[in-house]
Amino acid sequence: FFDLIVADVPCSGEGMFRKDEQAVRDWSLQNVELCWKRQRDILESVWPALKPGGLLVYSTCTFNHFEDEDNVQWIAEHLGAEVLTVPVEPDWKIFGQYHFLPGYVCGEGQFMAVLRKNGTPSGHTVRSEKGKPAKSEPLALRQWVEGDFHFFLHKDAYHAVPAEYASQVAMLRSCLNVLVAGVQLAVPKGRDWQPAHSL
């Protein structure tokens, strides 16, 4: 769905050591392991939302290879991506897959890599949603809203989104856990409708 995702992920914070003594006290090999595993969980969660051929900018404020180069290699091999090189001037003093090291650049330090998701951009096929099949929209609810709206059933409640955004909402709901989309209208109660608070 997205052409570009920037994932500035939570990390062990080695780039914060000079200005935050608590970051030094909190650092441990166990915390580094916790961080690189959490980072992979985050990346796996956002990856389906990146279009084939789309770009991922992956960044941390730490320097160890577990959270930096190893995760970039994991993205390339496990999720399917090409690591891109960004031409930079030698006097910028940026190393490897773009380590911005304190003492060489302004700031406390950072790591960055750019990857292109495998595949060629194409139309997205919307997967059918899990749960109850959509019922035909109740005509009574059409009288509750003005304008051109698309109605859909989600968690036993009818929702409405502007018709011009219906395909985008359906696409997002097919690959992400969308908590809220549009306006919840009502929940069926027998032959009646219980209006939602969002109205």
Model-derived regions, located:
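A short acidic, Gly/Pro-enriched loop at the edge of an enzyme's catalytic core
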Residues: 1-6
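Class I S-adenosyl-L-methionine
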Residues: 83-109
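Helix-to-beta-strand junctions that scaffold the AdoMet/dcAdoMet cofactor pocket
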Residues: 50-52
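Conserved Class I S-adenosyl-L-methionine
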Residues: 30, 69-89
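Polybasic, low-complexity RNA-engagement segments
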Residues: 108-111, 118-199
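Mobile active-site "lid"/loop adjacent to the S-adenosyl-L-methionine
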Residues: 7-44, 61-68
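A short hydrophobic/small-residue beta-strand
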Residues: 56-57
